[in-house]
């Protein structure tokens, strides 16, 4: 038996919004330590990794490990039936072919009960090696989303150049070129508004903007985003999920010739 209750149910709604446009179906691995998901997108260009720790839920029970094959589109549709203030409970029997979703209003006056059919998914787990990164940039997530959206008007790829004093986002296309430079902030009242850069060596890499725009669907989950970069290995875009875990997106850099 698996049962997880989340008083702040809107977090789960935001998680689905962050995933569903990139991956259509995925295996939710449920264990006593929490819920995790790892999946390549349908074109096998990017990878998503989600962790929701059990201690972040208001109550959590998992008697044995389960692999729940979920259509993210279906789950997103069902979660749209939950109000933003609703308490959400997920429940599955040990060998169930459905996942129950229960939505309760805070005053308990309305309880909605949905059952979603599960899928049989054949999923390969990819090992994600722990890496030391040449450059780690932490910045407001809304600012990152805005930069990706703005530069998408100019070109379909962005060059991210990271140096000690700041990070530059550059795009070029038929219209011309665009550059956005963010300097490391020295004194900011709100930590969430700060731009911080930890750099071992300068990095300059090119990434497809359409994928970065998919990743920014996770912006409502966190006020900050962390970009971790090193030459020739995938960029990691990480959004923390308050007291619960994170969603990480991995995207391999484009090779220079492709970026023109």
From Swiss-Prot:
GO terms for molecular function: DNA binding; DNA polymerase processivity factor activity. Its main location: nucleus. Residues 61-80 bind DNA. InterPro entries: DNA_clamp_sf (IPR046938), Pr_cel_nuc_antig (IPR000730), Pr_cel_nuc_antig_C (IPR022649), Pr_cel_nuc_antig_CS (IPR022659), Pr_cel_nuc_antig_N (IPR022648). There is a cross-link at residue 164 (Glycyl lysine isopeptide (Lys-Gly) (interchain with G-Cter in ubiquitin)). SUPFAM superfamilies: DNA clamp (SSF55979). Homotrimer. Forms a complex with activator 1 heteropentamer in the presence of ATP. Component of the replisome complex. Belongs to the PCNA family. This protein is an auxiliary protein of DNA polymerase delta and is involved in the control of eukaryotic DNA replication by increasing the polymerase's processibility during elongation of the leading strand. This is Proliferating cell nuclear antigen. It comes from Anguilla japonica.
